[in-house]
Amino acid sequence: MIACHIFQEGVAIEIAEAVVGALKGELAATAVNAPMVPAEVLSELAPYVVLAERLGRLAVQLVAGGSGMKSAKVVYKSARDPDDLDTRLLRAMITKGIIEPISDSFINLVNADFTAKKKGLRISEERVVVDASPELPVFSIQVQLSNVDSKFGSAVSGGGDISIEGKVKNGIPHLTQVGSFSVDVSLEGNLILCRQVDQPGMIGQVGNILGEQNVNVSFMSVGRTARRRNAIMAIGVDEEPNLESLKKIGEVPAIEEFVFLKL
């Protein structure tokens, strides 16, 4: 929670500076290559910037050898007409989230797109109209990474891309889709994703392993394709589990694969 609040404060400061600049008729972040976004759009999209950055950060950590990425696609689902949805700020934050974990440079709204191009990463966007409240600028954001291997096979969609999706709920970013599995976990702290056989006792087993090492579980969600078949367990943890804990999780017979993700 503390880390998320610190990040949100940093984003808030950056947005506030951009809003002040926009009110003066300046570009966002007062730089030529930063997203030029009107103040009213900045204000409306503020709750979504953390979601956008977190989804990008999660997606790149699912790649086996993240520096090999060449193509990413962002899908914005909204009740609004695509021409009425300004996504430049969200695109910049997603790009920042993808690039920062695999870059030695400091990444911000100004240099994110430039750094992505230097690394040969092409980012495309699609706006999809859905039946949702038009008062919300964005219903959900989906990030897809193409032509890469995944550390977590269950994050791969039917089309062969790494695919994750999220929403803002009550002002908090949530992960709602991993590959073809539906989940619902707050994107705060760190995250463990496990693919398992859907059977009783799995939550308790993993929780006990983490508890033995004094790792606090902040939330947990299970999504499955069918009863008693494969399921995805998403576990939020406040601390980073040590190697011993992660090894024990991998040794649970019903767990077929898992991945630890830093937020």
Regions found by a protein language model. Name each.
Residues 2-263:
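NAD(P)-dependent dehydrogenase/reductase Rossmann-like domain
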